[in-house]
Design a protein with these regions (language model features):
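Charged, amphipathic alpha-helical regulatory modules used
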Residues: 1-106
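Conserved catalytic cores of very large enzyme subunits
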Residues: 91, 97-435
Length: 435
């Protein structure tokens, strides 16, 4: 006995193919057959096929036999099997929906996300692909119960257009990437030797890597990352001044230090200005302006404080035409507040004052207390580790160096930088409680 395929070719009757097909259908509704149920399905299908007394059975007849066997064992799996069998017809309807949405995006635009400018061709392509990806996710990945729960409003699965491909938000370890150089695309980047180059390279890294995820991209404690490159520039400018200074000048050393500090301050201001322009004008390959956050404020050294103060001043001034400057959206700034550092007489009180001035005018930075109450503060107090937000509101739970989810011992420490989270699902708790 053989099965006649859709293309007219013949294939020997094989119960193993039935087992494979029914297991796939069962998996779609999170059901697992027992060995006895699988044996029943195989015996049922074989007996039914033989009862037809035909040498060749069409694939349509075989589908009907398997469907009948599944109805006898588990009607829900039978429905899953039937749905999958008819997926080509469903696919046509799905593509029709995607086409309708694509026409709307092309000729009307899309205003659902302020970070995506649907007037741009690259963004139109991305939005259309997202519509297709969302339909594929709903059709071939979500279970029937999940679809129904979403439809009824009990849950909401975020970012359905992207969550199958990559991760959501991350705390990117820019400092580790810069250190020693790295490869991006087909080009090797050497470690920056000056602050202005470090700003340029950091901007390239952000645009490239933020496009490989769909959530918020955070550069944690950026003041500490850039400070070593500020020191390199400082030394370079001092040597430059000494090279051209007249030995007869008085206080040459003091003049060299002032010259170097002024140049580093200018590099800082221009570097942050360049970052702001880059992140708000150059769309990523994902078709949007990436949601980039930087955290700062804990650096105590001269150049760490300079980098923080410079960003706060640049953001406070805004970008645009003279007389019509406006603060930009990205990078979002989060000030890491430590009462002992930033309170009256603290080592970083001056940074705090600049943050207050910036916040009063632009509503940035956001403020994250590390010495108050709650989870974030408790981790900082116990381990001295900062949990920067990923994007605007996602905070990682601890992962310990040796113990994983739980500390191996009292000396085990949590790791946050260099980690990410997966897609979010919102629960409608009042509806769930009422149910």
């Amino acid at each position: 006995m053989y099965v006649i395929k859709k293309d007219g070719t013949h294939e020997e009757f094989n119960v193993q193919k039935i087992i494979t097909a029914v297991n796939k259908s069962a998996a779609r509704i999170l059901y697992t057959f027992t060995d006895e149920e699988l044996q029943f399905l195989c015996d049922f299908a074989k007996d039914k096929a033989e009862s037809l007394k035909k040498e060749g059975i069409t694939i349509q007849e075989m589908h009907n036999i398997v469907e009948g066997a599944l109805e006898a064992v588990n009607p829900a799996v039978a429905k899953s099997y039937r749905d999958y069998r008819n997926y080509k017809l469903d696919f046509i309807h799905m593509m029709d929906d995607v086409y309708t949405k694509s026409q709307s995006i092309r000729y009307i635009g899309d205003k659902s996300n302020a970070n995506t400018d649907s007037a741009l061709v690259a963004t139109k392509r991305s939005l259309i692909f997202n519509e297709l990806n969302k339909e594929l996710y709903r059709k071939f990945f979500m279970t029937r119960d999940e679809l129904q729960a979403c439809k009824d409003g009990y849950i909401y699965i975020h970012d359905q257009s992207a969550r199958l491909d990559t991760m959501n938000c991350c705390l990117f370890n820019v400092g580790e990437v810069l250190r020693g150089g790295f490869e991006m695309g087909n080009v090797w980047y050497n470690e920056p030797k000056t602050l202005d180059t470090a700003f340029d390279v950091m901007g390239d890294i952000i645009l490239s890597t933020a496009a490989q995820q769909y959530g918020g991209f955070t550069v944690p404690e950026v003041d500490k990352i850039l400070a070593p490159y500020a020191m390199k520039s400082y030394r370079k400018y001092k040597e430059e001044f000494a090279k051209y200074a007249d030995p007869s000048w008085t206080n040459v050393e003091a003049q060299a230090e002032k010259y170097a500090r002024d140049k580093v301050k200018r590099d800082c201001d221009q570097g942050w200005q360049g970052i702001e322009y880059k992140l708000n004008t150059v769309g990523s390959s994902r078709g949007d302006y990436p949601f980039v956050t930087v955290t700062l404020g804990l650096g105590r050294s001269e150049f760490e404080k300079l980098i923080s103060i410079s960003l706060l001043e640049v953001h406070r001034e805004g970008q645009g035409k003279a007389g019509n400057k406006k603060p930009v959206l990205f990078p979002k700034i989060v000030f890491l507040y430590d009462e002992n550092l930033h309170g009256p007489g603290g080592a970083c009180e001056d940074v705090f004052e600049k943050g207050i001035q910036c916040s009063a005018k632009t509503m940035y930075p956001d403020w994250l207390s590390l010495t108050g109450e709650g989870y974030i503060a408790s981790m900082y107090k116990k381990y001295g580790k900062v949990i920067s937000p990923m994007g605007c509101r996602a905070f990682l739970s601890p992962w310990y160096e040796r113990g994983g989810m739980k500390p191996a011992d009292e000396n085990d420490e949590p790791v946050f930088v260099g980690r990410f989270n997966i897609g979010a699902v919102s629960l409608h708790l009042p509806m769930i409680l009422a149910k």
